[in-house]
Each structure stands twice: as structure tokens, then as C-alpha cells.
């Protein structure tokens, strides 16, 4: 099994979902993971995330109090605030939402 398929399968399992095979799927017609309340698209990269994104998540973690969920929000100038992207570590997501 290829690495990206194994990554999709492992993350699907962590979230209580099931990987959707790509066979017969048209891009955008189905998520990578079948889940009751989330549409999950997984991206796996050899190089990882850019440092500025990792730094923002690290800053959120360092400033979070005990019961706070550390998130980083990225807003693109000129876009609506509700179109901003929210990021968090998967482990924090699972712990907070009890998935």
C-alpha cells in the first residue's frame, strides 16, 4: 500500500471514519474519509508545513491556558473573516471533541 493511502487509513481510524477508495471517484465528488459529521480531505507532504504555520500553532500552544483549545487562524487580506482558515493539531482536535 502506498504511503498516502496508509496515512489516509490511519487518520480515518483515529477520527472514527473510513477511507474512501479513489477508484471510480471524480475529484471533489467524495471526501478522502467517510465520516458522519465531517467532510475530511487529507494531504500528506514529504516536506511538511511551512515554518510560519508551525510557528503560529506553537505560539497558540504556548499561550493556551489549561482548558483552552490552541488554534491558529489565517486570514487573507481582502477576504471575509468567515473565510479565514482555522488550524490545530489533530491530537488536540481529538481530545477536545472526543472523536
Can you annotate each of these PLM segments?
Residues 1-99:
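Catalytic phosphate/metal-binding cores of nucleic-acid and nucleotide-processing enzymes, i.e., regions
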